[in-house]
Amino acid sequence: MAQINIEITYAFPEHYYLKKFTLDEGTTVQSAILQSGILQQFTDIDLRENKIGIFSRPVKLTDSLNDGDRIEIYRPLLADPKEIRRKRAAQQAKDQEEKKKAEKSANKEN
């Protein structure tokens, strides 16, 4: 059976794990993850919860791999992106209002 070269990666805020290895052609994403040993190294990975992708595109655990694929195991989001944007916009509005008040106050003194 032909062999394919793949990579598996798991990223953290400050660093990332990357492993390159060779598997049989037709190997599934799940089988590659299991064979890589990453689940033993990082016990926080749960294949029922963590999203999986190949080159930033979501895939199913049952999908077959191609030569050169990079399996990416995504960590769960710690914060809701919509909520973060909402808070940032509110803070910017508050900062703008304070700036306007400071400018008015400075103009009155002159």
From Swiss-Prot:
Gene3D superfamilies attached to this UniProt entry: RnfH-like
List the residue ranges forming a coiled coil, or say none: none
Q: Which residue intervals are annotated with compositional bias (Basic and acidic residues) in the record?
A: 94-110
**Matching InterPro entries, A to Z?**
Mopterin_synth/thiamin_S_b (IPR016155), RnfH (IPR005346), RnfH_sf (IPR037021)
What's a Pfam family this protein contains? Ub-RnfH
What are the boundaries of the region Disordered? Answer: 86-110
Stated family? Belongs to the UPF0125 (RnfH) family.
This chain belongs to the protein called: Protein RnfH
What is the organism of origin for this protein? Mannheimia succiniciproducens (strain KCTC 0769BP / MBEL55E)
Name the gene for this chain: rnfH
